[in-house]
Amino acid sequence: MEKVRQVVAYQNHFEYFLKKQPVKVQNKIFKIIEAIETLEKVPANYLKSIRGTKGLYESRIKLGTDIWRVFCFFDKGKLVILLNGFVKKFQKTPKKEIEKAERLMESYYADKNKS
């Protein structure tokens, strides 16, 4: 399949999160990343904007009754930046996880503006 956008990880937060997950979860995450890269319109059950943030999205991973989230955002429309992930244990996404992702997004833009 041809890619319509590029997905990259910022720093090592996503990689660290990914390595701690079971292989089945890693495979599901890779499948969703592939969908984000290749589908022009990504289904909301894979990628959803987070209300109350400035451009933050969460990639949604479900396997059985367990749920994982990976935060990301778009840079220049076709570049998706993966930030951090967590295991979701409550209905609502924890505010501290959103705040961490927002700090990472700010850090990404600060680093980008330096170069």
Q: What feature does the model see in each segment?
A:
Residues 1-67, 76-80, 89-115:
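Basic, Lys/Arg-enriched alpha-helical interface segments
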Residues 83:
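ATP-dependent carboxylate-activation loops
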